[in-house]
Swiss-Prot record:
Signal peptide range in chain numbering: none
Gene symbol of the encoding locus: MET7
GO terms for biological process, alphabetical: one-carbon metabolic process
Lineage, uppermost ranks: Eukaryota, Fungi, Dikarya, Ascomycota, Saccharomycotina
Protein's name according to its UniProt entry: Folylpolyglutamate synthase
EC number: 6.3.2.17
Source superkingdom: Eukaryota
Amino acid sequence: MHKGKKNYPNLITSFRMNLKKIILNHDRFSHPERWKTNALLRFTFVYIKFLFDLMIIKNPLRMVGKTYRDAVTALNSLQSNYANIMAIRQTGDRKNTMTLLEMHEWSRRIGYSASDFNKLNIVHITGTKGKGSTAAFTSSILGQYKEQLPRIGLYTSPHLKSVRERIRINGEPISEEKFAKYFFEVWDRLDSTTSSLDKFPHMIPGSKPGYFKFLTLLSFHTFIQEDCKSCVYEVGVGGELDSTNIIEKPIVCGVTLLGIDHTFMLGDTIEEIAWNKGGIFKSGAPAFTVEKQPPQGLTILKERAEERKTTLTEVPPFKQLENVKLGIAGEFQKSNASLAVMLASEILHTSNILEEKIKCSSNASIPEKFIIGLQNTKWEGRCQVLEKGKNVWYIDGAHTKDSMVAASTWFRDTVRLSKRKKILLFNQQSRDANALVNNLYSSVSPEITFDDVIFTTNVTWKSGSYSADLVSMNTSQEDVEKLKVQESLVKNWNKIDDNRAKTHVTASIEEANELIETLYDEPADIFVTGSLHLVGGLLVVFDRIDVK
């Protein structure tokens, strides 16, 4: 480093913190309607967004040690910050057409071309609701064929308790040791290589890909080094411009139920969202989707399949699964499990393990190993039931209208006959939280009434700190500290709740758990839903209690 640049990282940190205060506190930035009429303001904020991106991603934290904790700290330095995300939302800057070109370049710099990933025999899954569950089902089915497929990779997002959950082999998160090993192999390769600034002007020396892109690169590196015979990849957001879409030749693609989500990136309509999701389709790789897709979305998916010179087949729920207890609870999971059956069938047939593909018919016969795989699927935080002392916890993360309706319906149907006290624990920090609570309330009422409702933040510990793997920079720290979302939720709940449940606000998940333990001497049913960060944080709190 040149002598004149010795204090550059400190200057960056200082400037970044002061700039953030200006942005978050300036009155103009809190009024979206002013963006429409003030071109200079829009330009200024986009430029500020660029500076934030430059400061955070272009100059990520430089590590001395190479432990797992060091890896997580370094990875967290690649997260997009709240101001950056808000700038994208406000300006409507949905598309970064350089994403895939940059992913190819990042791959080159760590020693791979996209064609190297073809050997992983990939299942590529997109959708709005259920894609993680479908990926888990598919991986579990393939895992029943260990003799022929000794290692199955699984890449999903987000994680609940540990970032290692995103990169699994044979259903288990890779170890802390392997995560750190492969993480720093990728990190160091990026540090020791450069890109042409003429072709990639943002990829200055020392720069790194963002959080999700880095993890995607890490997953490819890990699965290749571990000699995985087949891998299941869940899309991050959308499909067309998702970083996983450098996959050139998947064996098969799947699309779970479509809905409205990530509108600032994918569009405001089902048609736009379907177009983005269909971007993962590839020539020669058959595509499957669940039945009962929104008609407009299905039409677009079919058009995308034709455009990409492949087929799209709707998968009906298999009758053989009607009486099967799936590893992931919820009646709606039968559709995801059926889709997983067809995806796994393609992999196993292509690998010459199944002589014939399973017929895509509700009356088709499903092999016993498939059934076992579906029954043995483990997926924390999705329709999960935990007994803790005198209480029973019903846990299901949900961040869209459709997923909230499904989660709430599952809870309602499961506890309908229970006479226990009912408690709701909820948070959603980065989406329309009040709308989700309204969906929740209308889905459980009038059969279920809550005695107590607790709105918390996603902060893990009452000390104000987060579990290292759960640090998130994409929410307003000011809103968290002032409990703005939680106070708004209380007001909204009091308007819609005829039963007049007692409402509470806590500053951390640990405090919410302690409050619940003291509310009643008698047993209670507790419904935990909303943010997956809340779900993951609660499970981390439980883990610490169990250790004690």
